A protein has these predicted regions:
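Transmembrane alpha-helix/helix-exit interface in multi-pass inner-membrane proteins
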Residues: 26, 30-34, 67-92
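Short alpha-helical packing/oligomerization segments
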Residues: 96-116
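Helix-loop-helix hairpins and the membrane-proximal interhelical loops
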Residues: 12, 27-56
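N-terminal signal-anchor transmembrane alpha helix
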Residues: 3-35
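Transmembrane alpha-helical segments of integral membrane proteins
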Residues: 113-129
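Interfacial helix-start motif at the membrane-water boundary
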Residues: 46-73
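Alpha-helical transmembrane segments of multipass membrane proteins
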Residues: 20-28, 62, 145, 149, ...
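Terminal transmembrane helical module of multi-pass membrane proteins
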Residues: 124-161
Length: 161
């Protein structure tokens, strides 16, 4: 809780919007079960030769987009990803895996959020906002969480495949 006290109002608002987009995505995906059909290939259906490093590279590159846009992209990305995933799982009668998918997504998206907060260092200088965040540590933790999410995702794909 001490960490939350150190965040600026802008960062707190962003975190609330970030978590809201995740919840809205899951709700939208469970209501609209045909949502995934518009872009079936975009949800990471396992391919031949999937590995932890391929999953990590894909998720890490998306997270660099978060960094470059100071996290704004992640609000849409959360909604889109979780809508597709929830909708796909319902259509495959595999909704029981949703908690695992949420765990994986949460690790990866919190990692992305940490990397996005790293992008706030630029915004902070631009708007002359002062915070006590160590952006190098945030970047490291973000990358580590994305890697852990990739490992769990790989293990899930192997068990389902």
């Amino acid at each position: 809780m001490k960490i939350l006290r150190k965040l600026t109002k802008l960062e707190k608002i962003y975190i609330i919007l970030f978590l809201g987009s995740l919840v809205a995505g899951v709700v939208n995906g469970t209501i609209d079960i045909d949502y995934f059909k518009c872009c079936e290939d975009a949800i990471g259906v396992p391919e031949e030769g999937t590995s932890v490093l391929k999953i990590f590279r894909s998720n890490f590159l998306l997270s660099l987009t978060e960094l470059l846009t100071a996290g704004i992209f992640s609000l849409y990305y959360n909604f889109h990803t979780f809508s597709l995933t929830s909708s796909y799982l319902i259509s495959q009668n595999a909704l029981y895996t949703l908690p695992i998918i949420l765990l994986i997504g949460s690790l990866e998206l919190v990692g992305s959020l940490l990397m996005a907060l790293t992008g706030f260092s630029f915004v902070e200088r631009l708007l002359k906002i002062k915070s006590k965040l160590d952006y190098k540590i945030l970047f490291f933790y973000g990358a580590a969480l994305i890697f852990v999410g990739a490992v769990i995702e790989y293990l899930l794909l192997r068990s389902l495949g």
